[in-house]
Amino acid sequence: MKTPDCLLDEPMVLQGRRIHWIESKASFGDRYEYEYNCKNQLIPYTELFGPGAVVYWTGHIDELEDAEGIYLYDGSITDLKLRPE
């Protein structure tokens, strides 16, 4: 079974969103990359662990919308704070 890069012991809140995991991608999130990642990793993670965050460190196109339970971030996430639920 595949697991996310960071599977949280307890849910955390990031920008008002409850997350259970974080997946890190050292790639740019274009439509093809995001749809591929959703199908092969991210949607299965939401089914197993609940909602989570995917970070495209080099950014993503603005037109991408969060899939259900999957929240998109870029490298600026390092400026954000996680807090306990």
Stretches with model-predicted labels:
Residues T46-T58:
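Metal-dependent nuclease catalytic cores in nucleic-acid-processing enzymes
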Residues I22, A53-V55, Y71-Y73:
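Hydrophobic/aromatic beta-strand patches that form the interior of the parallel beta-sheet core
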Residues L7-D9, L48, H60:
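Intrinsically disordered, low-complexity regulatory regions
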Residues M1:
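A short acidic/basic microdomain associated with nuclease active sites
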Residues T58-E85:
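Domain-level recognition of nuclease-like catalytic cores that cleave nucleotide substrates
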Residues S27-I43, L48-F49:
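Mg2+/Mn2+-dependent nuclease catalytic core
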Residues P4-R31:
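Conserved catalytic cores of phosphodiester-cleaving nucleases, focusing on short active-site segments
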